[in-house]
A protein has these predicted regions:
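Cysteine-dependent hydrolase recognition
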Residues: 1-267
């Protein structure tokens, strides 16, 4: 069923500061105290979805205008860690958690349209197995520098063995950074073709920054995978850093109104 028929409670974060953070605007304690309170009185709550960008405190403590523009729902600590917002006193996570780091209502609408489109695409082709083969395909991207190639590829091969032999039954294709450097455009074309045809997940392991991976995946406008959106799992430094005033690579891709991906996870 479209949307999953969840029972949803919408909470305005600005109403929590007085009740759970001693009136301190933008303080992460408000959310943490609130979710611990909710766990006691509403034990069946399972998922938390934060809608709104957050900032690390160091980015706005000397400039309150940044707080108003970007710290719409605060994160916890430095570096920012949303899971700690939903942890108990023993730092045990209470709920599954995600964040859509938007600053404009139009970005929420764009993302919602992509979710609806993706669900409609899957629900209307679920019984046509040939058309759903793309949902069993996974791409692995092995980055890093020469001293790490063997190690990173070994880790990805271990993940490949698991996802191909468990109930998911995936078909995994691995692209290597050193191979891409040798084969150039030919390797990139194969990667683009796979994404355009549809994959369920792309996993990257290598060096990264907030705005870039060390594997060329181009920008969202380069792809034509409309409806066949995937999850991108990035295992690299700062790949998921969304608590700055500028947009990260994950935000640019997830919030794109064009195509490419639906969700970005990082470790």
């Amino acid at each position: 069923m479209a949307g999953g028929s969840y029972k949803v409670k919408i909470v305005d974060v600005t109403k929590l500061y007085d009740q759970f953070a001693y009136g301190i605007k933008g303080h992460s304690t408000a959310l943490r105290n609130y979710f611990n309170y909710v766990k006691e009185f509403y034990p069946n709550l399972a998922n938390v979805f934060i809608i709104g960008k957050g900032l690390e405190f160091k980015n706005y403590r000397k400039d309150k205008s940044k707080e108003d523009l970007f710290n719409l729902v605060p994160t916890y600590g430095i570096p920012g860690s949303d899971p700690l917002l939903v942890c108990d006193v023993n730092d045990k996570q209470l709920y599954a958690l995600g964040r859509l780091p938007v600053t404009e209502a139009s970005e929420v609408a764009t993302y919602l349209d992509k979710v609806k489109e993706h669900e409609y695409y899957i629900n209307n082709q679920a019984t046509e197995h040939e058309k759903m083969q793309w949902s069993k395909r996974i791409i692995h991207l092995a980055g890093g520098d020469p001293s790490l190639y063997e190690t990173l590829e070994s880790h990805l091969d271990g993940m490949k063995d698991i996802i191909q032999t468990n109930q998911f039954g995936a078909s995994v294709k691995t692209f290597h950074k050193e191979q891409s450097a040798i084969e150039g455009n030919e390797n990139l074309t194969e990667l683009m073709d796979m994404i355009n045809e549809g994959v369920s997940m792309i996993t990257f392991m290598g060096h990264s920054a907030q705005f870039k991976l060390d594997f060329n995946i181009l920008n969202p406008a380069s792809y034509q995978n409309k409806g066949k959106y995937h999850t991108f799992l990035a295992m690299g430094c700062y790949a998921g850093q969304i608590f700055e005033t500028y947009k990260s690579i994950s935000e640019l891709n997830n919030l794109s109104s064009i195509v490419f991906k639906l969700a970005w996870q990082y470790f």
